[in-house]
Amino acid sequence: MSAQQLRLLFLNFGHFADHLFMLIFAKAAVSAGLAFGLAGEGAYAEMIPYGLPSLILFGACAPIAAHIADKWSRNAMIVVFFIGIGFTSIMTSLSTGPIEIAIGLAALGVFAAIYHPVGITMVIEGGGRVGWRLGVNGVWGNMGVAAAPLITGFILAIYDWRLAFVLPGIISMLIGFSYWFFAYTGGAKAPEATAREKAHVGFAPGWQRALI
């Protein structure tokens, strides 16, 4: 596997992880609510609103993440994404009540906001088969959506809701440190667009017909 292929694999897994982490709570809410002493029938309805700040920050912090990446480093921001989302997931598992879960999930949402404006920008860098790379990256993101209830449900079946946050968190942090080493050794450099691709930046010939 070439350095560029490995770079894309890291970025694709980042999209998978981004959506997976944002949906862990949707599956684990009932178990967490029961652990906090909420009534069985109303546990889900009572717990779900505590995830709302996470969803708001997931969107609201994206422009901030993009600005920091432009001023600082996209590779560094991807490292922050992996380690930050993993660490906050582990911290969320230590919650002793709904308010603490809301705070933990809100922090998780801040780090989750990094991926889309930063990771997808990195996927399209360098020209070439941009559409193909975006398509594959999108599949990984959708797999994260699909895998979240399956993975979380499996962990809940064998243990409890805390492990559902801890296990993915540990894996994400390990990947973050791996990407840091990969970038530190020069493997995460963005590919250069060819001179021909640079000369053709702009609208494709006949683009006006697409508007009719």
Predicted regions and their residues:
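Pair of pore-lining "gating" transmembrane helices in MFS-fold secondary transporters
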Residues: 2-30, 206-212
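Small-residue (Gly/Pro/Ala) motifs that create kinks and tight helix-helix packing interfaces
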Residues: 29, 120, 144-156, 164
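Conserved MFS/SLC helix-loop-helix module at the cytosolic interface between two early adjacent transmembrane helices
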Residues: 59-96
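Paired small-residue
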Residues: 88, 99-107
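Cytoplasmic helix-loop-helix junction between adjacent transmembrane helices
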Residues: 104-141
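C-terminal membrane-cytosol helix-exit motif in multi-pass small-molecule transporters
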Residues: 169-193
